[in-house]
Amino acid sequence: MTTGTPDCLILIAEDNAADLALVREALKEHQVECSLHVSNDGAKAIAFLHALDVDPKAPQLDLVLLDMHLPKRDGEDVLKTLRSTDRYGQTPVIVMTASDSPEAQQTAEKNAALYYFRKPSSLSEFMQLGALVRSVLSPSIGQAESGTGAKKNAGGRK
């Protein structure tokens, strides 16, 4: 399901409805006005990435918000698929997970995730994610609003 404006595109791969609602609220609060494509399992996220990759008219994918514990295909599979595509291999990824295991963080780092975000349990904590998304996308949003500018490399914490 894709919603929003066509100026930028975010893939949200999240199977938890409550967490998805918090992510949406955080994006809204931080005025992130992008098209959102939501996949509630890893297989659907991978199918979406493949569909984008083979369609030369598909929009640019600006960001992926990725839960690592997805049904059918896990977040690591989604991340590896994304990194293997020519067109979207450099797309910024923010990994969202409830896991605090060193292995989960190493997997994210190994696959060049820009940020590793430990999922909190409250809206106020999710607001940090909204601010992070806004900072990653600010060059894209600025380009869409002004018609100029270049994307910068966003520094990350991992």
Predicted feature descriptions by range:
Residues 24, 38-63:
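Acidic, metal-coordinating helix/loop segments flanking the phosphotransfer/catalytic sites
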Residues 114:
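Short, glycine/charged-rich "phosphate-handling" switch motifs in NTP-dependent
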Residues 121-133:
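C-terminal output helix
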Residues 66, 71, 101:
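The feature encodes the CheY-like receiver
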Residues 38, 70-73, 110:
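Residue-level signal for the "D+5" position in two-component response regulator receiver
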Residues 62, 66-67, 97:
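Active-site residues of response regulator receiver
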Residues 7-18, 23-27:
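Conserved acidic segment of CheY-like receiver
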